[in-house]
C-alpha cells in the first residue's frame, strides 16, 4: 500500500522537464490588411501602397515654377487681354493654373475656334519664345493700326485692344487689299493667332473697312480658309453688337503662312515659337501657390510620394502615382499579429498548431524558446528570417516597380457642342478607372494571402526541422513545443537550433527515461482503478447510512410509520 501511495504521489507531482518550442514574432502593431478570404487581419509589419494625403499647396514642379493665370484664362493670356498684362512676359512654366473665377478671356465677344484643342496642345509645351510676327510700325503702311480699340477691352478706363493682335481698319477712305506672309525660321513650331470681325450693320462695315464685300484669306501648307464677314444685328454683349471669331494654327519649320484681306482682319502682331517635349498641363485650382517643390502636383495639393497608387485626385501633373478609387491598399510583409495570452501560456494559431506569437522575440520573425536548469530564453532563427525578409522585400519591390508607372493625367478638353462626346469619354475613363482599381485591389489581396501562407509554411518547416532531429528523444506536447526525455543544457539547446543535434548521444538516456515514465503511467492506471472502486463503495455506504438515519428520525417523531406484515 505504501508503494502505491508513493506512485500516486508521483502522479500528482509536476516533473519539470527541459523543453524547446518553435514560435514566431509578435508586437504591438495595429496594422491590418485584407486577403482574399479575410478582412482586417492584424499583421506585425506591412507597407502602404496608397497615397491619400497632400500638402494643400501648388508648388514648383522639379524646380520650375507654375504659371498662375489668376483671373485670366488661357484665351485671355494668349490673345493679350488688357486685364492680363501681368502675364505679358510669361514665357516658361511647369504647368498652368486657372482658378474657378478665371473669367478674363476674350474681351470682345465672339467664339474662339478649336479653343479646347489649343488647350490640349499646351499639355506638351512648357515654354515659348514670343516675337513680333508682323511688326506694327512697318507691316501695314497703307492701313490704320491705332484706331482699332474698343470699350469692351478697356484698360485704365480707356478703350484698348488685345496686346498680341492688331485691329486693322481703313486709312482715310480706303482699305486696299493687303497681303502679308511669314516664313517660319525658328527651328520649331510657331503658334499664330488671328481674328475676323463681324460687324452688326453695313454702315459699321463701311465705317471701319470701306469695302462692303470684304473677305479674309489665310493659307499655309496645312491650313487654308477664306472668311467672309457675317453682318447681322445681334444682342449686345459687353456693350458690343458685333462679334469677333478667333483662330489659330501651328506653322511648321520652313512653312509659310499668308494673310490676304480686303477688310475685317484682326491681324497677328505677336506669335509664339513653341518648345515641346515635356509634360505640362492646365489645372483648375483655388489652392495657393507656395515656395515649395514637388514631383507630382494635383489640383488639391502636391504629392511627395513614391507609392504606386493615390486617391487624392484623378488629374495629376508630373511623376505621379496612378489614381484609383480605393480607400486602402496595404500589403502585408510580416506575420499575423496574435500575441500570446498569458493565461494560455506562451502560445496561442499560426500554421494551425501554434496559438500566439512572442513579443519577447524581437530579433527575428521565427525562432525558439527554451527552458532548462540553466534558465530560459528566446532566440530567433536568423537564416529562415533573413530568407523570408529577402523574398518578401523582393516581391514588394517587384509589385511597386510594375505598378508604379509615374505619369501626367490631365483632363481632356471639350467645348459646349461636344457634351455627348465628353459624357462618353467620362464613361470610358470611369471604366478604365474601375479596372485599374479592381486590378490593384485584387493584386494586393492575392499577395497578402500568399505572404501569410508563406509565413505559416516557414513556421511549419522550422517545427518539422526540430521534430526530425529529436525523433523519439522528445515528445510533442502541443503548441509547437517538445519535452525532452533527457537533460538538455544550453549547448544541447543550441545544437537543436542550428541543426547539429546529436541524436545518438542522448538516445540511451532518453530510452531509459521514456521506459520509466511509461512504467509510472501503467502503475498509475492500476492505482486509479483501485481508487475508483473504493470511491464507489464508500459513496454507496455513505448514502445507505444517511438514508437509515433519516428513516429512524422520522419514525421516532411519528412522521414515518413502519408496518411489518407476516
UniProtKB/Swiss-Prot annotation:
Q: Which InterPro entries match?
A: Capsid_hemagglutn, Hemagglutn_HA1_a/b_dom_sf, Hemagglutn_influenz_A, Hemagglutn_influenz_A/B
What is the top-level taxon of the source organism? Viruses
Q: How is it modified after translation?
A: Palmitoylated. In natural infection, inactive HA is matured into HA1 and HA2 outside the cell by one or more trypsin-like, arginine-specific endoprotease secreted by the bronchial epithelial cells. One identified protease that may be involved in this process is secreted in lungs by club cells.
State which residue ranges cross the membrane. 530-550
Q: Provide the membrane topology annotation.
A: Single-pass type I membrane protein
A GO cellular component annotation in the UniProt record: virion membrane
Q: Which residues lie on this side of the membrane: Extracellular?
A: 18-529
Subcellular locations according to the entry: Virion membrane; Host apical cell membrane
Residues carrying lipid (S-palmitoyl cysteine): 555, 562, 565
Signal peptide positions on this chain = 1-17
The record places the following residue ranges in the Cytoplasmic compartment, namely 551-566
- Which is a GO BP term held by this UniProt record? fusion of virus membrane with host endosome membrane
Gene3D superfamilies on file: 3.90.20.10, 3.90.209.20, Hemagglutinin Chain A, Domain 2
Q: Which SUPFAM superfamilies match?
A: Influenza hemagglutinin (stalk) (SSF58064), Viral protein domain (SSF49818)
Question: What GO MF annotations does this protein's record show?
Answer: host cell surface receptor binding
Q: Which residues, renumbered to this chain, are glycosylated?
A: 27-28, 40, 104, 304, 498
What the record says about family reads: Belongs to the influenza viruses hemagglutinin family.
Extra notes?
Answer: Major glycoprotein, comprises over 80% of the envelope proteins present in virus particle. The extent of infection into host organism is determined by HA. Influenza viruses bud from the apical surface of polarized epithelial cells (e.g. bronchial epithelial cells) into lumen of lungs and are therefore usually pneumotropic. The reason is that HA is cleaved by tryptase clara which is restricted to lungs. However, HAs of H5 and H7 pantropic avian viruses subtypes can be cleaved by furin and subtilisin-type enzymes, allowing the virus to grow in other organs than lungs.
Under which name does UniProt file this protein?
Answer: Hemagglutinin
Mind giving the lineage of the organism this protein is from? Viruses, Riboviria, Orthornavirae, Negarnaviricota, Polyploviricotina
Amino acid at each position: 500500500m505504501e508503494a502505491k501511495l508513493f506512485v500516486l504521489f508521483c502522479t500528482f507531482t509536476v516533473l519539470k522537464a527541459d523543453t524547446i518550442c518553435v514560435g514566431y514574432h509578435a508586437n504591438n502593431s495595429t496594422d491590418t490588411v485584407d486577403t482574399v478570404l479575410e478582412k482586417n487581419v492584424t499583421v506585425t509589419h506591412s507597407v502602404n501602397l496608397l497615397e491619400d494625403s497632400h500638402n494643400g499647396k501648388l508648388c514648383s514642379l522639379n524646380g520650375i515654377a507654375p504659371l498662375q493665370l489668376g483671373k485670366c484664362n488661357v484665351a485671355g493670356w494668349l490673345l493679350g487681354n488688357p486685364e492680363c498684362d501681368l502675364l505679358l512676359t510669361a514665357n516658361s512654366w511647369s504647368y498652368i493654373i486657372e482658378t474657378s473665377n478665371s473669367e478674363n478671356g476674350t474681351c470682345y465677344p465672339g467664339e474662339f475656334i478649336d479653343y479646347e484643342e489649343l488647350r490640349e496642345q499646351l499639355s506638351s509645351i512648357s515654354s515659348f519664345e514670343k516675337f513680333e510676327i508682323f511688326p506694327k510700325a512697318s507691316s501695314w503702311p497703307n492701313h490704320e493700326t491705332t484706331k482699332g480699340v474698343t470699350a469692351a477691352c478697356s484698360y485704365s478706363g480707356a478703350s484698348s485692344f488685345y496686346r498680341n493682335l492688331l485691329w486693322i481698319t481703313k486709312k482715310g477712305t480706303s482699305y486696299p487689299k493687303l497681303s502679308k506672309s511669314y516664313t517660319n525660321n525658328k527651328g520649331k513650331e510657331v503658334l499664330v493667332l488671328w481674328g475676323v470681325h463681324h460687324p452688326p450693320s453695313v454702315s459699321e462695315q463701311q465705317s471701319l473697312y470701306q469695302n462692303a464685300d470684304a473677305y479674309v484669306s489665310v493659307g499655309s501648307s496645312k491650313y487654308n480658309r477664306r472668311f467672309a464677314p457675317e453682318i447681322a444685328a445681334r444682342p449686345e454683349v459687353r456693350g458690343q453688337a458685333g462679334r469677333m471669331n478667333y483662330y489659330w494654327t501651328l506653322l511648321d519649320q520652313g512653312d509659310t503662312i499668308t494673310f490676304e484681306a480686303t477688310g475685317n482682319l484682326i491681324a497677328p502682331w505677336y506669335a509664339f515659337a513653341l518648345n515641346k517635349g515635356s509634360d505640362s498641363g492646365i489645372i483648375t485650382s483655388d489652392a495657393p501657390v507656395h515656395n515649395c517643390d514637388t514631383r507630382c502636383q494635383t489640383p488639391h495639393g502636391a504629392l511627395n510620394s513614391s507609392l504606386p497608387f493615390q486617391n487624392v485626385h484623378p488629374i495629376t501633373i508630373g511623376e505621379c502615382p496612378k489614381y484609383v478609387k480605393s480607400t486602402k491598399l496595404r500589403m502585408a510583409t510580416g506575420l499575423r499579429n496574435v500575441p500570446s495570452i498569458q493565461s494560455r501560456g506562451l502560445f496561442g494559431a499560426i500554421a494551425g498548431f501554434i496559438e500566439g506569437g512572442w513579443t519577447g522575440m524581437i530579433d527575428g520573425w521565427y525562432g525558439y524558446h527554451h527552458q532548462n536548469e540553466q534558465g530560459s530564453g528566446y532566440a530567433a532563427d536568423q537564416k529562415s528570417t533573413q530568407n523570408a525578409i529577402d523574398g518578401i522585400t523582393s516581391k514588394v519591390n517587384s509589385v511597386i516597380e510594375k505598378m508604379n508607372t509615374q505619369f501626367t493625367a490631365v483632363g481632356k478638353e471639350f467645348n459646349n457642342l461636344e457634351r455627348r462626346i465628353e459624357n462618353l469619354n467620362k464613361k470610358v475613363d470611369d471604366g478604365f478607372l474601375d479596372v485599374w482599381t479592381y486590378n490593384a485591389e485584387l493584386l494586393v489581396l492575392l499577395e497578402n494571402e500568399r505572404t501569410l501562407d508563406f509565413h505559416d509554411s516557414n513556421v511549419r518547416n522550422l517545427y518539422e526541422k526540430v521534430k526530425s532531429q529529436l525523433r523519439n528523444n522528445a515528445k510533442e506536447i502541443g503548441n509547437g513545443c517538445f519535452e525532452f526525455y533527457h537533460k538538455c543544457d544550453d549547448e544541447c539547446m543550441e545544437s537543436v537550433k542550428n541543426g547539429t543535434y546529436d541524436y545518438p548521444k542522448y538516445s540511451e538516456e532518453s530510452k531509459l527515461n521514456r521506459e520509466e515514465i511509461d512504467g509510472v503511467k501503467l502503475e498509475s492506471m492500476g492505482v486509479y482503478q483501485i481508487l475508483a472502486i473504493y470511491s464507489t463503495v464508500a459513496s454507496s455506504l455513505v448514502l445507505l447510512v444517511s438514508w437509515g438515519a433519516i428513516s429512524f428520525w422520522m419514525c421516532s417523531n411519528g412522521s414515518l410509520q413502519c408496518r411489518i406484515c407476516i
